[in-house]
Amino acid sequence: MPAQLLGDHVRFRFTPADAGVTGVVLQCDRAVPGGREFRRDADRGGWVLDVPRPALQRVEYRFAVERGDDIEVVTDPGNPVTVRTAFGDRSVTEMPGYAPPWWLGAPAVPGRLDPHTLSGETTHEVPVTVWTPADLADEDPAPLLLVHDGPEYDQLAAVTAYSGALVAAGHLPPHRVALAHPVIRDAWYSGSPQYLRTIAAAGLDGLEARYAVRGRVVVAGASLGGLTALLLGLLAAPRVGGVFAQSGSFFQVRHDDAESGHRYFGRISRLVQSVLDMRHAEQPLVVGMTCGALEDNAANNRDMATALHRAGHDVTLTEVADLHNYTAWRDALDPCLTDVLRRVWDHGG
């Protein structure tokens, strides 16, 4: 049976197919309140766990099923609703009122995907796959959106489906989406000066040599990719006119002790502090940010939005009732990314 919302709590149930189960533990984000260990249900058999209803639209979870010293991590066999994530499949329970974005089922312009590589200062070339509306020729001028973690953003957050649907609906002009591949993700997406300079200079030069780019570029990303999008925007302005950062990893010593073991935490926190300390923007950006109100990055995203606004950037931070995952990022693309794209591309873009 899928998880049930029963008034002020959610009930999870696990009915094993064998008698050897000795314990069941709920695996989910710590933003979900309550305990994690199931109890035996003497009345109905199996195992049951009640947790307070979280202030979330969706909960992604798995079960850790114990058989003595052996532990098997599984999706909920009683729940047919699952989601692909960057870390494997998860079961999902959706709260009343949740709905996927309208554009997922809407008509969309077809597109084509063309692979490229960008060369510069990085030790490895940067692979980039460019999505283009099928009826848009390479020499036709069109705006450009560059997305970090591009393949995952497309597979798990449907970013090119979003673009195709928004173009078909007339909400966005025909545009191209450059999906950047994270070959050495932690190194590149932690403020690597070589990576940032590669994309800001030779990378954008290469894309503009291949395609007719109209106006200012918008760069996007999530988590470490959100940090990278912001740093790239600050470096490459005014060539880059807009930034869209989702759940950006704007690590600070005072907020993010849990991340202090990250290999590049020192570099990230120093770069973040330098942005927080800025008082004036020579080239103001349009910055859209989204973050789960209950996720670990919420405090550092609020600080970053405040600092960017103080420096003169045009900033909108939208907090959502979800967490650090691609479905949350997908669900916030419209209107949050749409607003950034329209404002950059309609005014000098």
Where are these regions (language model features)?
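Non-catalytic cap/lid and distal C-terminal segments of serine-dependent acyl enzymes
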Residues: 1-35, 41-349
